[in-house]
A protein has these predicted regions:
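Phosphate-binding glycine-rich loops and adjacent basic patches that engage nucleotide phosphates
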Residues: 7-18, 59-68, 104
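Short, charged, surface-exposed interaction patches
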Residues: 16, 21-30, 62-66, 77
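Extracellular/lumenal/periplasmic "stalk" regions immediately C-terminal to a signal peptide or transmembrane helix
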Residues: 1-20, 25, 38
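Periplasmic OmpA-like peptidoglycan-binding domain that tethers envelope proteins to the cell wall
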Residues: 1, 31-54, 58, 67-148
């Protein structure tokens, strides 16, 4: 689609950021420090690039279509241990998705009624296995336009 074509042009071959089908996927390493939900500076910069394009795309969506940008957080399958902030990967993935949504609303001016934050923990992997590479692929934030 034109939307994903524009995203590819802006982001080029940025490491840790890719487009797969109808989803825009950030590696968690680009956005967050390990086991943290606060956006890193690099993550803020990448989100700002994407939101600039999202605004243009949103303006092109016909008025009768009630859309939302889904922000989905995913983790690897390594259990969280001894974290004062998160009891498990469900909580970490939800907190990361919410951190992205709040940044988009509070810092970038996205309308809050057009965003949703969802956490899936380790239960929707894109790579199978326990290798470092598989786990890295599964630690991600996905953005997807969908109808409400």
């Amino acid at each position: 689609s034109e939307f994903f074509g524009r995203l590819r042009d802006v982001l080029g071959t940025q490491e840790g950021v890719r487009i797969v089908g109808d989803r825009f996927i950030f590696s968690s390493e680009v956005l967050f420090e390990p086991a943290q939900a606060e956006l890193a500076e690099e993550g803020q910069a990448e989100l700002t690039k994407v939101v600039d394009i999202l605004r243009n795309v949103a303006n092109d969506i016909p008025e009768g279509i009630d859309w939302v940008l889904q922000v989905d957080g995913h983790t690897d399958n390594v259990p969280i241990r001894n974290s004062p902030n998160f009891a498990n990967n469900w909580e970490l993935s939800q907190a990361r998705a919410l951190s992205v949504v709040l940044y988009m609303v509070e810092q970038l001016g996205m309308p809050p009624d057009r965003l949703s934050a969802n956490g899936f923990g380790e239960f929707q992997p894109v790579a199978v296995g326990d290798s470092d590479d598989a786990r890295a692929q599964n630690r991600r934030i996905e953005l997807k336009f969908t109808e409400k």
